[in-house]
Amino acid sequence: MSNQNSKKHLGHTARKRFGQNFLHDMNVIHNIVSAINPKNGQFLFEIGPGLGALTEPVAEQVDKLTVVELDRDLAERLRHHPFLNHKLTIIEQDALRFNFREYFESLELKEGEGVRVFGNLPYNISTPLMFHLFKFHDLIQDMHFMLQKEVVKRLCAAPNSKAYGRLTIMAQYYCQVVPVLEVPPTAFKPAPKVDSAVVRLMPHKVLPHPVKDVYWLNRVTTQAFNQRRKTLRNALSTLFSPEQLEALNIDLNARAENLSIADYARLANWLYDNPPAVDNQEEIIDEDI
């Protein structure tokens, strides 16, 4: 089989720049839809419907579904779908730049209601897209995403592990994180070079460790995990003196992965009250988020 044919599915050639890998294993699809458990009357929103592997079985169970798709060819296919088109609201836009708050608020959600978001996310944008969605956690009931297996491990990680990092802390700050199922490369066309997994993210109704400004939580976790091999005495030296860390009950010889979310929230709130005179925001290194 030619390389071009191996990337083609249902007449559409996967586009590398969009990170497209199309799900086609019916058992996996069934298990994902069962995990989502869509119900009529719920507000369902799919990111990256692609060729409709999840769109079709979800839409069969509900009267309406909103999807956001960047690929104009795929959006056009959905507009002309033989039995879904009347159920779909299709937004042809980049999900990373989409104003979810404006759209979700336009739905006039009742108290206690939230949007149910799901999707087989392009792996090249999955982490920044989740960070984008966390901003709208108060309007979301839950999220079910297909991700790279290693990313799911990081989302679910506990302190004192290699997988524990900035992504862990920010995800668990906003959400309860539950792994759902693992998915082999053979479930996709073209097959990715990595294993995949599905995760459920359920935003907390009340944040367990609230911070006064999430900027400082981002700030302190970025600096700590960008230098995760250093002790916190050294990694956070531009933000805290050793005496200040000790006063906040932080072990000076601990490293970034040793602190809990509650510890980082305490550091963030102290920085909010005592911001450094000069705040040289460090560049975020993808491998540590």
Curated annotation (Swiss-Prot):
It is found in: Cytoplasm. It is an enzyme of class 2 (transferase). GO terms for molecular function: 16S rRNA (adenine(1518)-N(6)/adenine(1519)-N(6))-dimethyltransferase activity; RNA binding. It comes from the Bacteria. One of its GO terms (cellular component) is cytosol. InterPro entries: KsgA/Erm (IPR001737), rRNA_Ade_diMease-like_C (IPR023165), rRNA_Ade_Mease_Trfase_CS (IPR020596), rRNA_Ade_methylase_Trfase_N (IPR020598), rRNA_adenine_dimethylase (IPR011530), SAM-dependent_MTases_sf (IPR029063). It catalyses: adenosine(1518)/adenosine(1519) in 16S rRNA + 4 S-adenosyl-L-methionine = N(6)-dimethyladenosine(1518)/N(6)-dimethyladenosine(1519) in 16S rRNA + 4 S-adenosyl-L-homocysteine + 4 H(+). Its EC number is 2.1.1.182. Keywords: Cytoplasm, Methyltransferase, RNA-binding, rRNA processing, S-adenosyl-L-methionine, Transferase. S-adenosyl-L-methionine binds at residues 21, 23, 48, 69, 94, 120. Its main location: cytoplasm. Belongs to the class I-like SAM-binding methyltransferase superfamily. rRNA adenine N(6)-methyltransferase family. RsmA subfamily. Specifically dimethylates two adjacent adenosines (A1518 and A1519) in the loop of a conserved hairpin near the 3'-end of 16S rRNA in the 30S particle. May play a critical role in biogenesis of 30S subunits. This is Ribosomal RNA small subunit methyltransferase A. It comes from Actinobacillus pleuropneumoniae serotype 3 (strain JL03). The lineage of its organism: Bacteria, Pseudomonadati, Pseudomonadota, Gammaproteobacteria, Pasteurellales. The gene is rsmA.
